[in-house]
């Protein structure tokens, strides 16, 4: 391919059209260095279309476009043909084919692919919430959360929080340590929102030893000591008993399995 300009015209951002053009260009050796892509977004008037056609006519460029408003699309096609400018309609024929095959009527509204729905924003918000209120960083998150996970170290609190966040649930998690008093919010929040993550001493002992090894540390450290683990789990049992919340045994469960159990529990509650 010799040096040429491809004009990407869109009534929205033009990202979709540019990606298609780049995919096509990639099929030609060395073409990415020889081809200039010029994106013209948010085209809604005939004047802009005439300007682009004049540019393409002058330098022998190609116009690739995603224009969903029929009048604007038809105008570009008509003007390009008058000027003998090569054009390619990326989305129009597909919309028309889908209307013909499925019997649906298109909305013909620019930018719909970027009109992110409420569901998407809820997911993003939940993920940000999980990060902000991870590992008991801010106890205020306990009262704002849909779910509060509590458990000793290495009971998958953080990955569970993130997994559930992708289901649009705001999750805070709180570590339970005998030497640290749990935040008072744990005892004022609705117990039905709290889930205790239970684990067997032997399983936790194995997990912690593997964790220490992965960090290059001695697996005989107090962190993986079975007596210390039993002490932590006894303290955990006292806390969940005081809260009066449900408990899920995570001993031999994958994160996905535990998350689905918790999700189902919350769904039934609602």
Curated annotation (Swiss-Prot):
The keyword Zinc appears for this protein: no
Binding-site positions, ADP: 151-158
EC number annotated for this UniProt entry: 2.7.11.32, 2.7.4.27
InterPro entries for the chain: Kinase-pyrophosphorylase, PPDK_reg
One Pfam family here: Kinase-PPPase
Keyword line: Kinase, Nucleotide-binding, Serine/threonine-protein kinase, Transferase
Catalytic reactions on record: N(tele)-phospho-L-histidyl/L-threonyl-[pyruvate, phosphate dikinase] + ADP = N(tele)-phospho-L-histidyl/O-phospho-L-threonyl-[pyruvate, phosphate dikinase] + AMP + H(+); N(tele)-phospho-L-histidyl/O-phospho-L-threonyl-[pyruvate, phosphate dikinase] + phosphate + H(+) = N(tele)-phospho-L-histidyl/L-threonyl-[pyruvate, phosphate dikinase] + diphosphate
UniProt superkingdom: Bacteria
The protein's role, per its UniProt record: Bifunctional serine/threonine kinase and phosphorylase involved in the regulation of the pyruvate, phosphate dikinase (PPDK) by catalyzing its phosphorylation/dephosphorylation.
Similarity field: Belongs to the pyruvate, phosphate/water dikinase regulatory protein family. PDRP subfamily.
PANTHER family from the UniProt entry: PYRUVATE, PHOSPHATE DIKINASE REGULATORY PROTEIN 1, CHLOROPLASTIC
Name of the protein this chain belongs to: Putative pyruvate, phosphate dikinase regulatory protein
